[in-house]
Amino acid sequence: MKVSFFSRRAAKNAGWLVAGRVLHMALAFLVNLLTARYLGPSNYGLVNYAALYTAFFTSFATLGLSSLLLKDFMDDPEGAGTTVGTAIAMRLLSSTLSAVSILAIVAAVDRGERLTMTVVALYSMSLIFQAFDTIQYWFQSRLESKYATIATSVGYIIVSFYKVLLLVLGKDVRWFAISNTIDYAVAAIVFL
């Protein structure tokens, strides 16, 4: 009887994770399609250039802690608060160092390209807010991904509306570059 209860909880937990991903992918597809058409190849390429650096450095910024955190949360649920705090502090440090590294590389590679530097700087700030994703692993370990999914979905819905508003208002590429950072910032605020 206990096994079926656990399986049901695990299935619900997985369902929330899948639903969140599907929502995120559907919104991303629609909004990115509109954004790409609006920005054009040059500016959309610039945003993707910034995204490339950020994606590469994300592996350094996260420190590979996800599986370790899940295991630690399951092994020591009472110490979860300390674990979350320590992991967030570690990730804030590594994220800040990663963002600074990105800026140093881009400054060396793209000398004099002020727009490129600005877009990359705005986009790479998202690494700092990604440190708060650590809380999501705590929810996953407790089979309560519903709350983490709601937090990240609220953030992404807000950012999707923000991007559509930017399209309507005719804003430039800098405004789109910061949208990724706003996505993670809103999720971090909702998590806290």
What are the residue ranges of the model-derived segments?
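Small-residue-rich midsections of specific transmembrane alpha-helices
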Residues: 21, 27-31, 42, 48-75, ...
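Helix-terminus/linker motif at the lipid-water interface of multi-pass membrane proteins
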Residues: 26-43, 167-171
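Transmembrane helix-loop junction
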Residues: 37, 41, 71-75, 107, ...
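N-terminal membrane topogenesis motif
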Residues: 1-27, 78-81, 85
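Residues that define the loop-to-transmembrane-helix transition and helix capping
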Residues: 42-45, 81, 85, 117, ...
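Specific pore-lining/lateral-gate transmembrane helices of multi-pass inner-membrane transport
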Residues: 59, 72-90
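Hydrophobic/aromatic positions within or immediately flanking transmembrane alpha-helices
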Residues: 18, 45-48, 88, 149, ...
